[in-house]
Amino acid sequence: SSWSVDQVVAKIRGEVGTKVNLVLLRNNDKIDVSITRAEVSSPTVEAEIVDGVGILTVSRFNGETAVLARAEAEKFLTAGVDRVILDLRGNPGGEVSAAQGLAGLWLDGQTVLTQRRGSEIIRTDKSTGKPILGSTKTVVLINGGSASASEIVAGALRDHGKATLVGEKSYGKGSVQAVIRLSGGSELKVTESRWFTPNGKNIDGKGIEPDVKVELT
């Protein structure tokens, strides 16, 4: 077929509970399949313990991220984990509040970022929640796909001395933008402010350099 994956998915998607009939081709034989559409949930947090090290992988930041991460962190402590790897590779970001909650596993109501317009600080965001991993040795993995909220967390944990960053330079998304709709249907994206790490570094267009450079796969 000349259809792209996105085109196929668009055809299959539909209202939850309804059925879709598919014809599959296997070894030149056609197979009719009927499936019932359902909501697909992809958790933003996955965790495992390998050789006594707790590995927390966060794929994006949304409303459930901080809650899921805290639940997994509590399991780490119950299991006696004393070292944690926070994997933010390929995480494009998401909600700042989720970044505050994730950082709150290590930070105790401390600044995770400031937003500035020119030289004026217009907003300060702090970590939320109890820092149950505050004394746990932590490594944060980043790469060129780690952006926005991922960079907020990575930058904050390093600036506060809670983690060592390992991997490759991050994406470099350190601005807050607004979209202005123009006549004729066009849009103009305007940078409203820039955000800075707790130590006052803006990474927009520059990214965060890891403490230990390693090409990660």
Positions of predicted regions on the chain:
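Cleft-lining beta-strand/loop regions that shape enzyme active-site pockets
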Residues: 1, 5-183
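Well-ordered beta-strand positions in beta-sheet-rich domains
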Residues: 32-34, 187, 211
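Short acidic, Pro/Gly- and aromatic-enriched capping/linker segments at domain boundaries
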Residues: 182-194, 209
